[in-house]
């Protein structure tokens, strides 16, 4: 069962357009919360990827963070591939032109 908190996170995440990324911090701010780690847990258990695009969530400094519970390896390579397919370039584990690619919720 998906919690009300997770449902809200997933709904917000689905509003992030292709070609953009957001952060755990931006998601938390949009929810009027400081629960960054809880949002990370919600991302790890995303039942509807890639329709709910958790690959678009990165760390506040533009580095990739994790993907599907992994910090490196094939899962993170998949995250890079998904982002690249959407026009987001990653170099050295960081989103290129991060400030321009960052999606901030209204």
Annotated model-derived regions:
Residues 1-106:
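Nucleic acid-binding interface residues in structured DNA/RNA-binding domains
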């Amino acid at each position: 069962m998906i919690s009300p908190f997770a449902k809200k996170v997933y709904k917000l995440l689905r509003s992030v357009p292709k070609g953009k990324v957001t952060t755990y911090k931006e998601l938390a701010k949009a929810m009027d919360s400081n629960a960054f780690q809880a949002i990370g847990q919600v991302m790890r258990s995303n039942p509807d990827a890639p329709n709910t695009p958790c690959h678009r969530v990165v760390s506040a400094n533009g580095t990739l963070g994790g993907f599907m519970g992994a910090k490196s390896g094939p899962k993170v390579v998949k995250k890079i591939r998904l982002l690249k397919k959407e026009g987001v370039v990653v170099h050295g584990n960081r989103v290129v032109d991060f400030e321009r690619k960052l999606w901030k919720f209204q």
